[in-house]
From Swiss-Prot:
Gene assigned in the entry: Apobec4
Functional description taken from the UniProt entry: Putative C to U editing enzyme whose physiological substrate is not yet known.
Organism superkingdom: Eukaryota
Protein name: Putative C->U-editing enzyme APOBEC-4
GO molecular function: hydrolase activity; metal ion binding
Organism: Rattus norvegicus (Rat)
Length: 388
């Protein structure tokens, strides 16, 4: 494998040229280092706000930014980084990351521990002719079927009908989602925002991400994105309370206690719809978000459900001649025929015995009858002589 990229070590990570021929360009402020790893992947909060539209709803912009995480099968973080688009060559970050012989291809080829790729993008991936992001992602996953991909985005890119490529992008998203469970597509919302802020954004005061994570406008936009991606991919999203599922063990308990005291926390399902009349700065900490299935969860079977246990026995293998020998009697005749003949002989002997007994009984009865008749005749003769 001859890599297309060049990587340089820095004090807090690495910087990568996705294509070795890139050079400093006046048309692109990020050239030539569009991929950054480690702590080099952090961006200022102002840039994050303008790119991802957080904490307010998104608005049209041309910059593409993708954060990524590479994790092992147990969920341990192997590498984190970011990729930015190139305005000079009109290349999207997903196209750079999933390029054949590109940066991710080389990493996974040399490190078999990487099993999960998680992307956090401000735009959903597209498949337009100048970028082919989804096509490259699809081919990448075909080469690494043991690797899963989870894509989270803050807004859909060119899927509305007013864009000429909308139908093509929707069909490409549907095809990528068909690789489920290897691939999941979800809107960023709830606790995922908090995770991104803590991992990839710099210049945030302590406790801001937990106490003031959402606004009503951001909440409605996240729900709309989840609904739209569900309609496009026809894959039903699953929701959970992300603030609890994403809570880290070393999180400051006082910060979480402050968030739990908010009036909108732990609301009932009937109260999930936010009140638009409230202050836009009110944190919507009750937001339900798609659950990220990394690291994979192995659910044990229910103890109440019976399990079918199949035991395989090794039977004795006999040759055909031995099988025939076992089936025959010592006299060399088939067992079934010999038993049938013995049974018929016994029945004939029993019949002969019964016949002889019946004949003897018949003769005895006949002799008794004859004696009785003779006696009766003698009695009749005596009576007739007396009457004369």
């Amino acid at each position: 494998m001859e890599p297309l990229y060049e990587e340089y070590l820095t004090h807090s990570g690495t910087i990568v040229k996705p294509y070795y021929w890139l050079s400093v360009s006046l048309n692109c402020t990020n050239c030539p280092y569009h991929i950054r790893t480690g702590e080099e992947a952090r961006v200022p909060y102002t840039e994050f706000h303008q790119t991802f539209g957080f904490p307010w709803s998104t608005y049209p912009q041309t910059k593409h930014l993708t954060f990524y995480e590479l994790r092992s099968s147990s969920g341990n973080l192997i590498q984190k980084g970011l990729a930015s688009n190139c305005t000079g060559s009109h290349t999207h970050p997903e196209s750079m990351l999933f390029e054949r012989d590109g940066y991710l291809d080389s990493l996974i080829f040399h490190d078999s521990n990487i099993r999960h790729i998680i992307l956090y993008s401000n735009n959903s991936p597209c498949d337009e002719a100048n970028h082919c992001c989804i096509s490259k992602m699809y081919n990448f996953l075909m080469n690494y079927p043991e690797v899963t991909l989870s894509v989270f985005f803050s807004q859909l890119y060119h899927t509305e009908n007013q864009f000429p490529t909308s139908a093509w992008n929707r069909e490409a998203l549907r095809g990528l989602a068909s690789l489920w469970p290897q691939v999941t597509l979800s809107a960023i919302s709830g606790g995922i925002w908090q995770s991104i802020l803590e991992t990839f954004v710099s210049g945030i005061s302590e406790g801001l991400t937990a106490v003031r994570p959402f606004t009503a406008g951001r909440t409605l936009t996240d729900r709309y994105n989840a609904y739209e991606i569900n309609c496009i991919t026809e894959v039903k999203p699953y929701f959970t309370d992300a603030l609890h599922s994403w809570q880290k063990e070393n999180q400051d308990q006082k910060v979480w206690a402050a968030s739990e005291n908010q009036p909108l926390h732990n609301t009932t399902p009937a109260q999930w719809q936010p009140d638009m009349s409230q202050d836009c700065r009110t944190p919507a900490v009750f937001m339900l978000v798609p659950y990220r299935d990394l690291p994979p969860i192995h659910v044990n079977p229910s103890p109440q459900k019976p399990r079918t246990v199949v035991r395989h026995l090794n039977t004795l293998q006999l040759s055909a001649s031995k099988v025939k020998a076992l089936r025959k009697s010592p006299s060399g005749r088939p067992v079934k025929k010999e038993e049938a003949r013995k049974g018929s002989t016994r029945s004939q002997e029993a019949n002969e015995t019964n016949k002889s007994k019946w004949k003897k009984q018949t003769l005895f009865i006949k002799s008794n009858i004859c004696h009785l008749l003779e006696r009766e005749q003698k009695k009749i003769g005596i009576l007739s002589s007396w009457s004369v």
